[in-house]
Amino acid sequence: MNSIGAIGYISKKPDPNRILKECQDKDIPILAIRAVQAGALTSKMDREPHPSGRDKPDFDDYERAEPFRELAKKWDESPASLAHRYALSTQKVSSVILGVKNTQELKECLDTENMSELDEEKIKELKNLFT
């Protein structure tokens, strides 16, 4: 997932993988945001597309994330939980900002935080989905 969302003031698309590697190499803690990629890594989008089309990249990412949802189902986990576990399992991620809208989503995130980190095999399988 590479959508930066509706942020319109960035003139060049950042390379999240390069930034992540630089932070890891330089021992810089990472604050993870958009762990569920504005809803793309959840079971369903909870909103309609904006008439201006400004959130089209988020909806495109949702379509591209179908293999991710299938993998979450195979592992008997919700897509949102798996996305948060992936973020929490990433080397040098110190915190994850949650984008929850209700207490049910908050509870799921808190439950996820108490789960074990993903093992290397699962992390590799997830990375292979989008490379």
Locate predicted features:
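Beta/alpha (TIM)-barrel catalytic core signal, keyed to glycine-rich beta->alpha loops juxtaposed to Asp/Glu
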Residues: M1-T131
